[in-house]
C-alpha cells in the first residue's frame, strides 16, 4: 500500500512529461462505437418523435434537427477537450467543481420549472442542466483527491472530509429536486472509493449508510414511494401511477423477438408519454424487439469495458489521475 501511495503522490511530477512523450491518441474502437451509438440515437429520436413533432409545430424533423445541432456542438467541444492535457484538467478541477456548485445554486433561482422540478437553466437557444456538469466535476474532484491524498484512505475518520463538497452538491440536488442525479452521484462516489482502495470493512459501512439514507429519502416523499411501488407492480394501477410502465411493457411485448420494424411503433403515437425522451427504450424494444435491446445493452457494456481497459492502461503507465477519470 505504501508503494502505491508513493507512486500516486509522485504522479503530478511525471504526468506532463509522459503525456508529451505518448501524445494524444484516441482509442479508435471506442470512437467508432460511440459514432455508431450516436447515429443510432439520431435514427431513434426521429422515429420516436414524429408524432410529437407534428403536434408541436408540424415539422417532423424538429427533434432530429435540434439533436443534430447539439451533436455537432458536443462533437466540437469533445474534440477540444480531448486535446487538453490531463495535467491541466487536474489543475482546473477546483475551478470546475466550484463552478458546478455555483450552477446548482443558480438553478434554484433561475431554473426553468418542468413537471414541478427546477433542473434546467435557460441560456438563449439552449437549456443547461447543472447536475450533468456536477457529475463530471465529482469524477474530476475525486480522481484528483485520491491521486494527491491516497494515504487518507487509511484513516476512516478523514474519508468523510473527501465528501464535503459532494454532500453540498447532493443537498442542492435534493432542493431541485432531482433524486435520480442524487443516486447517480452517490454511485460515482462509492465506485471511486472502492477503486481507490478503501478497506473492505469501511467500504461496506459506507454502502450501508448510503443505502439507508437513500431509502429514508424515498420514504419521506410520497411521490417517490409511489414510483417505487409502481415499479414493483405497475399493473396495480395501470391507468394511474403505473401508466407509463405498463405501456412500456406493452411496447416491448409487442416487439417480441425482432420487433415490428423501424417506424412501426404504435405506443409512440401518444399512448406512451415521453416516448421520444425518457421512455425511448420502449420504442426501441417495440421496433427492434428483444434482440435489438440486447444488442443495445451489449454496446453500452462494451463502451464501459473499453473505458475500464483504458483506465487500466493509464494505471500501468502510472497515470493514476487519468485512470480514475476513465473508470469514473
Language-model-detected regions and their locations in the chain:
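Short, Lys/Arg-rich, polar N-terminal cytosolic tail immediately upstream
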Residues: 1-23
